Amino acid sequence: MILQALTAYYEQLLKQGKVEAPGWDSRFKVSYELRLGPDGQLLALNDLRQEVPKGKKTVIAPRELPVPHRVKRASGVAANFLCDNTSYLLGADEKGKPERSRQCFEACAALHHKVLDGVDSPAAKAILAFFDSWKPDTAPTHPLLAGQWAALNNNANLVFGYESPDGAHWLATTDDAIRAAWQSAFDTSDADAETARCLITGKEAGIARIHPAIKGVMGAQAAGAALVSFNAPAFCSYGHEQGANAPVSEYAAFAYTTALNLLLADRNCCQRIGDTTIVCWAENAAPAYSNAMLMFFCGGAEARGVSESDLAAALKALSQGRPVSFLDDKLDPNQNFYVLGISPNAARLSVRFFLHSSFGQFAKNLQDHADRLEITRPAFDKRENLSVWTLAQETVNQKSRDKNPSPQLVGDLLRAILTGGPYPATLLNGVTLRIRAEREVTRGRAAILKAYYLRNYPTELNKEVFTVSLNESSHVPYVLGRLFSVLETIQSVANPGINATIKDRYFNSACATPATAFPTLVKLAQKHLQKMTTPNEVHFSKQLTELMAQLPETGFPVRLSLPEQGAFEIGYYHQTQKRYAKKNEEE
């Protein structure tokens, strides 16, 4: 299903003229042009690099150009057509292996003769003349190359260009005759390949032995990684080798890898969260869909010129099945939409999840998730929404050396949000451990507790307790959390400037085993009340009386279950935020 969807996306892009036909890579980083004259002599070395923005500054980067399809190299010699590095196009490099450089140059010359012999094009004849006359030993000291030799050998890719006698010049990759010759060679390249029925197209065709590399996944090898590969006998079916184990035609392998590489290269279609790289696309290939989805999911709307209010309005409308205008395009909630999560695994890619639904259904799942997360927040917290990464960070000790959340947790959380499924238990466990260790219920942790119990255990009691702000629920654990917050406030008012409160010593025991902590805390509060002014004493005594009256006559519970501890923590958070809100109003 993944490969079929990516192939269909490629074909949609091809119809729209946004990608090259099979046999060509749409975007390849090229740094220099080797401009040739009619006799094949090197006339100039042109720098094709350009300034591109990177963060708050600009950097010099290679230009992305369409080039003939690249071969996937391992350790052997394999030349590319028209565009390659100095080892292949010039026969020299700084790797200290002159014999191998000579072999690379000879292989490249043979490839160009095979494709271009007999082609009636001045540019083609110039390229062949270059290979026939070029002396690789002279490359490092050539007057046109010596000044840039270090840069040429710094992972730079070169492409042939041509200048006619009248001064007109163009890249060889744009020459019609050369393009036609390459297309013919590429189309017949699989003539000797093993044929079988392609699993993607359903047609009999030459099978790709090795699939093109996928590049752009953070953490994967720089040379690229494989989504489909077989590199050991244990993975192979009897009598089959490499790609024959899962027959995919050369065309389909090119199509799906081209589509995925384009998505990974477009920051509006791709987002990294933890070790998972997420790519998303609409069936009609309209970029506004993936752009909007990543804003909904990961934030960053204002950086892309969209206000938070407009984004929220668009999400709400789509979740209700209504089309909206967004980024100069119309978003249809019925449009088929895909989300793929992949992670690096040495030279391969692991699929974390692959989801397919209507765009409106994804929007509804995200809206439901946002509604469950909504909770009163401190005045200093200006964030409208909590991203997936922010939620996962709430499970991590920020003082530890490794501040990254579990990759498994991040992947499970992503899937739960996008599918509308139950949140992973590891999310609740991680948050509970951090609350116990730090004795701190942050907005993020309170939001997670609320969302977890409302989605995973949507009982009437949980709907009553886990609300956006303070409520008058008489659920005992919730009341105990409120009571603990009031007791902490009484101590702070009675002892201004105190360094540590009862929260530092008693929070965990009060949350898990109330009967062991609260009797002591209530007695301590009576002493604190005696230190206060009469108005404060009356105010807090009234609060204590009202909350104590909601507790059972049998006294404080001996212990609280994990869900009851969640209610305690929410009660504590609600009451504490109510106190801070009142204080801010008075100021």
Where are these regions (language model features)?
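Conserved phosphate-interacting/catalytic interface
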Residues: 1-190, 235-587
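Short, solvent-exposed secondary-structure capping/transition elements
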Residues: 207-211, 268-269
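Short metal-coordination and nucleic-acid-contact micro-motifs, chiefly zinc-binding Cys/His arrays
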Residues: 190-196
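Short microdomains enriched in Cys/His and/or Lys/Arg
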Residues: 209-245
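Short Cys/His-rich metal-coordination motifs, predominantly Zn2+-binding knuckles/fingers
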Residues: 201-204
